[in-house]
Amino acid sequence: YNLIASAFGHHIYESRWLRDQKYLDQYIHVWFRGNGGQPMKKLATFSSWAADAILNRYKVNGNKEYMLDMLPDLESEYKRWESTHRLSSGLFWQGDVQDGMEESISGGRKKKYARPTINSYMFGNAKALSQMALLAGKKDEAALYEHKADTIKNLVENKLWSVKHGFFETYRTDSLANVREAIGYIPWYFNLPDANKYDLAWKQVTDEGGFLAPYGLTTAERRHPLFRMAGCCKCEWDGAIWPFATAQTMTAMANFMNNYKQTVLNDSTYFHLMELYV
């Protein structure tokens, strides 16, 4: 079907505003049931925050019946990721290409590193599954997924936060990657970080040595010696500006501004960055 798995969650977030929801109904069903009643194979490879997105779609259209019909599919997907991508630390690993973010500074196509992406997605999915379970009257399952979310949150804050750089980073085999990348903002996409402890990270969006560039926000900090040094491919995430990354970062920024008491950013900053990009 020429589907793109890496942005599946983003597609749901965007399409939930369509007046005619039959297209998104079918799109979700194709991904989860379009392979002879089973999920499409790419869904088992590329990172996804489908459960979170489907819950947020429900908050727009109010179709609880459709959402709860998808609950078994979403639970199966979550358990599969737990069985295939969880490290001994409890964090989840992913290759950068399977995040849709290949040739990054911090990762690699076959590197099993704990990235802010997959761990934030799994947190968001666990929180969503907990809320869905409550709506389905399954209190024990709701408590289980809430516990899973809390565990991931603590691991992200304690293992992926760089005190040195004031940023969420990728954790390699035995240390942080020592580079700020736009994926370090994804925890706020799901309101994961505690308030007032990690606000410092957002100073980098207004710093020209950080992510601020003439045409928007870069995918890696501009001061890093490996910024835009890959030089190998058409899709490079070592600093190039991408719509996918910009959408994630700006959503995370909106959450940070709307849901946290903070003094780092204001409305003018947000709209200036949006104007630069568009």
Question: How would you label these PLM feature ranges?
Answer:
Residues 87-88, 131-140, 160-166, 260-261:
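Surface-exposed helix-capping loop/turn segments at secondary-structure junctions
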Residues 11, 149, 187:
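Conserved hydrophobic/aromatic pocket- or pore-lining residues that grip, position, or stack substrates
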Residues 1-2, 18-41, 83-114, 154-241:
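Extended glycan-interaction surfaces of carbohydrate-active proteins
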